[in-house]
Amino acid sequence: MLVQPIELITELYPEIVGEITRSNNDEVISHLKSAEDFIKGYLFKYDLKALFGTTTDAPTIVDESLKKCVKIVASYWLVRKANPNVNLDQFKNDWDFMIGTKESPGWLIDVKNGDINPEWPYKPDDPLTTDIDESEIENPVFWASNKKRTNSF
């Protein structure tokens, strides 16, 4: 897991997390995992094992913006469940800044669209992919153009 439950203290006070989850650490872990899975959906073209790690290996790329994004998503989902003494507008603003919408894209959507280019590794090429020249495959689509003509008047 990229973000551990103790790291949520940058977004929410521990006593607030304890009140929301009723001190159930498994619920915090569940929110963090679902936030990571949500973000992985946006970052499909990058090497997710290098960015997020696996259950046995730690991530090889450490990016604080990515960790911040996971924490904001998980925190937003936690405070939506119950918001004891929490300003939801602040979390909505953080969500809009990090995730955004189609009309007003945030950091994560800009990374997905290629407007922001973090120096993350792309997925490795699949070695089972064959080197087929797709232009030589019989295809129902036919590309052609008329011969160029020179007209003199």
Describe the function of each predicted region.
Residues 1-64, 125-153:
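Conserved short "hinge" loops at termini or chain/domain junctions
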Residues 7, 27, 34, 65, ...:
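Exposed alpha-helical structural elements
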Residues 39-42, 46, 73-85:
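Amphipathic alpha-helical interaction segments
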Residues 64-73:
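Elongated alpha-helical scaffolds
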Residues 76-153:
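Short loop/turn elements at secondary-structure junctions
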